[in-house]
Amino acid sequence: MASQYPGHQLDDIPSTNVYRPPPRHEDDEAEHALLHQNSAYQSQYDDPHSRPLTPGQESVYTLNESYVGGDPSKVPVTSYNPQYTQPYGQGYGMNNSRPGFPTPGPPDPIDRTDSTEAWRERQAPGFGTIKRYATRKVKLVQGSVLSIDYPVPSAIQNAIQAKYRNDLEGGSEEFTHMRYTAATCDPDDFTLKNGYNLRPAMYNRHTELLIAITYYNEDKVLTARTLHGVMQNIRDIVNLKKSEFWNKGGPAWQKIVVCLVFDGIDPCDKNTLDVLATIGVYQDGVMKKDVDGKETVAHIFEYTTQLSVTANQQLIRPNDNDATSLPPAQMIFCLKQKNSKKINSHRWLFNAFGRILNPEVCILLDAGTKPGSKSLMALWQAFYNDKDLGGACGEIHAMLGPGGVFGRKLLNPLVAAQNFEYKISNILDKPLESSFGYVSVLPGAFSAYRFRAIMGRPLEQYFHGDHTLSKRLGKKGIEGMNIFKKNMFLAEDRILCFELVAKAGSKWHLSYVKASKAETDVPEGAPEFIGQRRRWLNGSFAASIYSLMHFSRMYKSGHNLIRMFFLHIQMIYNIVSVLLSWFSLASFWLTTKVLMDLVGQPSTSNDNSAFPFGNTATPIINTILQYLYLAFLLLQFILALGNRPKGSKVAYIISFCLFGLIQLYVIVLSMYLVVRAFTTKNGTDIVTNEGANEFVKSFFASTGPGIVIIALAATFGLYFVASFLYMDPWHMFTSFAQYLLLMPSFINILMIYAFSNWHDVSWGTKGSDKADVLPSAQTKKDEKSKTAVVEEVDKPQADIDSQFEATVRRALAPYKPPEEKEEKTLEDSYKNFRTRLVATWIFSNALLAVAITSDSLDRFGFTVR
């Protein structure tokens, strides 16, 4: 590919010694990758001590990059233009002790991948060198807004296809420079009036689709998975041949903006920043912690890129003659200085960026959620074809690993149960609610809204949960709320859904789009699963009560009579659901006890014997299991009120196993009852010769098979029939059994823990000490123009490129999951001792009471006939 930026290109350097993980079908784009297997070239990045000739060592990079020609005899000695080599005499120069030189020194901050401290050191202007750079004067916008353009590395510039690079709009720098803005204001004040702007608006482009990715602390694999999935979906839209919309009024890619909002510097994974730097959206050493003493609230980077990194650390670049090349994507990267929660991230998205870009549709994604092929286009089409559609969501399914619907993660019963939950929700719940026009929850991990539909009261109510507005809102803010309302905002997406449908004078409705799919990671361990469901259960319960209490606001909306009729039906359905959920604890216990009593103590009016251990042993075993059930139910309250899940991991795992075993026993008993109903005389004594009325009476009698058939059809048949009608039945064979076994735990463990920790709303912000390492921006009066300017380091292109080499190495290095420390804290040990003491005290006294008050001589409450 011809280049107008000499010196540095992304050249292919294949190597046979390079290890490449097994390709995954969703990420494998071999035609674009910079890696080919049949070549003898040696990587120019590898350390001399880790080359194949060194015993016991092996290069594990999935991609090799070069910024010089493909001559394997050359080593990556960084060269500079003469005017930058040693501008201040022989005592100054590059301190090159990185791989590729004869004697590598200790790793310096530019190369280290596993050190947050290394990232801190890289934030200093001119890091990695002791040279003195020239400076340039940057004028502040309206005297207060710091916005600077920085040249991107030559390799990134050269990766842009010529047809885009040569079609610049009036000197546009979107492919050659990254724009950095230090936002020192609240999101509500990020306006054109205050001097803030964004590139798509500066280029007078209409934004049809704003794709937002919210991030907290996900690793680079999860982030790359989401971002690459978005890039592939943008390609699907750009490649549309017969579109009535996208191919008119300018290129399709100019109507799409991708916005990444990172919730704080402190929790952010610094390796993820290297991935963003590799595609040009971020650079080390440019952020300012304050401007003239006014603290920076958010660091905003803008760049239009054609590069992407896959989940297995493979860099994808475009090819000129390939229709499957990724098109340009307009990127906005907002890195908040402090951790201020997801609602605040959405305030930056909607109130700051949304008001400037004014998009038609906003799609929300969580980092780690990968949209499927053409999924984003399917969501957008739903809005395009329905002018009254205010919000929509697609199908979210659990990530099961290699093997697709038969992935190896299904071996974990917790993952399998969650997979079944997701599938049944997408088959039964979401379509039903969509037919009514009100989907109670559009998951924040994968949903879309029409921007003008949520403007006004829906967003105002939604942002009451932002703790950064607590002082401004007073009693209406998060600090003035009672504990019920605070829990309500743990399920903030439900609040937005209700406010959107109930918006006064409007007739917006919500929908489920089956054609749009996305996959997401689910918790694989008991402690993580319990912690996640605490927030979900408490938030959804509070939000459900809120929507029922404020249903009268629907009468102020613009919905027609038919829609209002179905909304009333849905209200009744929601009331029943809340009641069933409220009494589910007793329901499971009663079901377990009644089934055990029916089978273990059969009526004397028939000849049936106790099943499965006979008339003597079965009642004893049933009583033991019932006492164990109640004992572990009580234990859940003790654990939930005094311990955190990670500190009581073993106790929770044992609880999951015990409730699963009891549920398995109950399922066996229920199957026995079904067989007995159809095989015994009393069970099949149906009147068939005295008319339809007598037939129905005998069929649905207490001893008839009708009740059993209805129970089976409602429990098992509905799931099977609906799954086959949706042409997606595989979860019934891979996950249904695990779900049945874990169903009691979902109630007895998760709900007890959630309600017992109703007080935990977790609104506090974490520290942000990482911002302390950032330099400040101090303005000076320009002698000529008398305006406020900031002196900024002006790095030569050669130095930018040399530092980019190390960035690519860090970004494409194989991901090493951090080792989770299982050591319990001192506080955990104290709480565990307290739990064991209280449990031993309660259960020993209960055992004594049962033994003494038992009517029979069997001191454990057994009643043997």
From Swiss-Prot:
Q: Which UniProt keywords apply?
A: Cell membrane, Cell wall biogenesis/degradation, Glycoprotein, Glycosyltransferase, Membrane, Transferase, Transmembrane, Transmembrane helix
Q: Which GO terms describe its molecular function?
A: chitin synthase activity
Tell me the domain of life. Eukaryota
Give the residue spans that cross the bilayer: 565-585, 620-640, 650-670, 707-727, 735-755, 837-857
Q: Which reaction does it catalyse?
A: [(1->4)-N-acetyl-beta-D-glucosaminyl](n) + UDP-N-acetyl-alpha-D-glucosamine = [(1->4)-N-acetyl-beta-D-glucosaminyl](n+1) + UDP + H(+)
* Bilayer topology annotation: Multi-pass membrane protein
Q: Which segments carry the region annotation Disordered?
A: 1-59
Q: Which residues are glycosylated?
A: 64, 95, 538, 682
Induction trigger? Highly expressed under stress conditions, such as the shift of cells to temperatures commensurate with infection, or to conditions that induce cellular morphogenesis in this fungus. The promoter contains a negative regulatory element between -1600 and -780 bp.
One biological process term from GO is: chitin biosynthetic process
Q: Does the keyword Glycosyltransferase apply?
A: yes
Q: What is its EC number?
A: 2.4.1.16
Name where it mostly resides: membrane
Q: What does this protein do?
A: Polymerizes chitin, a structural polymer of the cell wall and septum, by transferring the sugar moiety of UDP-GlcNAc to the non-reducing end of the growing chitin polymer. Is not only stable at different pH, but is also able to tolerate a broad temperature range. With CHS2, plays an important role in virulence.
The record's annotation in PANTHER family points to: CHITIN SYNTHASE, CHITIN SYNTHASE B
In its UniProt entry, what is this protein called?
Chitin synthase 3
Q: Which organism is it from?
A: Exophiala dermatitidis (strain ATCC 34100 / CBS 525.76 / NIH/UT8656)
